[in-house]
């Protein structure tokens, strides 16, 4: 083979190899692009399939950019449909409660800028849980924190952070409020915020960050609401509000709200005599609330809300082991399901309970007279049998030597069931701890578990002698 032939042969082989490599690169590029587009391909409905006509919200479109061998390819990710929550799954079967979260706000206040708060609660959107509280318009290490034992001032605002994040200076102030409730309907947050003069307060209804509706005081005597989460089913949210005396008959109404707009108001009906600070949970197809009777009963009122026809039924928790504070000792206390027990009914504390078939799970202070300690347990027959007192699965959340406060319920939807969780307010400062001039709180949070669990105590834990005065 002469030199020219060798050159031609080598060139031909090189060209062939280069062509093969080029074709392979094209094949790889085509395969990569095809697989990427297929991953985000929007499925179209088959022919003749009927699609729902009700309004839906589509999240803001997102564009994904992929770089392949210096070529930019853009493909729009499919819009994600956002639907109202319906809470139709069954309630989770539990054996008790396991620790979930603790924010340690008071301990952190000894060396950092943390808000002075009270009336905390927890609520979750479909993807994340948040903690709320009513701030006093000041941090703890600030002279404005003096005399923050007062409940109602124009400086109080509703604070909102991810659960477990203390209320630092960067915390969002959702609205002006000295009484509040919040819930997520599956599409956006609803906040009910009460503020103003005691004799002529205003409740603002804020949905998706916008003021949508409002209502003024109807009895001119401290309009107030739940201090825990409201509940939304298929786009209709319910919130229990009371206006009137805290120690005699008051005027309680249940408001039905759709995307921030009041669509109906129902008066309280049934045998409950006094209803305040309800802890509500979804009980499909309705809403159930366990509340505070601040007039006649140390047994807790129950309010059942029908979301479809706006009807209301009320009664009392049947358990003879009653949930309010103050109360009689367990030997002497009673409850017969329908009426207040007239046992140390004047005064009380926000609390919770929820039904489990014929039984009831509940939490309460360990002390019968003061907001000290906290315990949970199940009462067999406590939801259906008058004066039932068989207690099982008792747990200590806060030992009796430490302070507690308000407590309330919130619900979390899992893959197959709805779990019940609760929080406990851990109050510190005035009136009991007179070394300091402020009153504030931290929280501890537990959730239902079907597993096993141990024992412990989870108090606030701050050494009052180390705290700013």
From Swiss-Prot:
Intravirion side: 1-9
Record-annotated active site: 151, 406
Membrane topology: Single-pass type II membrane protein
InterPro entries (alphabetical): Glyco_hydro_34, Sialidase_Influenza_A/B, Sialidase_sf
Pfam families on file: Neur
Enzymatic reactions: Hydrolysis of alpha-(2->3)-, alpha-(2->6)-, alpha-(2->8)- glycosidic linkages of terminal sialic acid residues in oligosaccharides, glycoproteins, glycolipids, colominic acid and synthetic substrates
Subcellular location(s) of the protein: Virion membrane; Host apical cell membrane
Region (Involved in apical transport and lipid raft association): 11-33
Residues exposed to the Virion surface side: 31-469
GO MF annotation: an example: metal ion binding
Annotated glycan sites: 61, 70, 86, 146, 200, 234, 402
Region of interest called Head of neuraminidase, as start-end residue ranges on this chain: 91-469
Maturation and modification: N-glycosylated.
Cofactor: Ca(2+)
Entry's transmembrane regions: 10-30
UniProt keyword terms in alphabetical order: Calcium, Disulfide bond, Glycoprotein, Glycosidase, Host cell membrane, Host membrane, Hydrolase, Membrane, Metal-binding, Signal-anchor, Transmembrane, Transmembrane helix, Virion
Positions that bind Ca(2+): 293, 297, 324
Subunit structure as annotated in this protein's UniProt entry: Homotetramer.
Function: Catalyzes the removal of terminal sialic acid residues from viral and cellular glycoconjugates. Cleaves off the terminal sialic acids on the glycosylated HA during virus budding to facilitate virus release. Additionally helps virus spread through the circulation by further removing sialic acids from the cell surface. These cleavages prevent self-aggregation and ensure the efficient spread of the progeny virus from cell to cell. Otherwise, infection would be limited to one round of replication.
Name of the molecule in the record: Neuraminidase
